[in-house]
């Protein structure tokens, strides 16, 4: 059986970096809960995970996520990552900007029976929109 760290690494490698959204069915529980303040209305389970993937894939096709550091504690993993890409598609109602972005974030997962049961994600949303020239401070 794969370790929790290996499961999450596979989620990054296959789901995010290879755009294999179908892998969510294998890696997430049927009642998976995704806590993302940017997308609070996602359905539970792998379908919600795939919907999140479709949204970001449309806005940042070809983006790459790299994990920089880990904390593994029993049934939980926490990782610090950065994703990079070009905003070449719409993000909700916002049009594509053609701008490059590099955005840091953290992802905390709780595992049950060898699958991701709950996820919390926080990323630098303000920095993301500043890089797209869609937000300013001051």
Question: Where do the model's predicted regions map?
Answer:
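C-terminal and inter-domain tail/linker signature
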Residues: 1-138
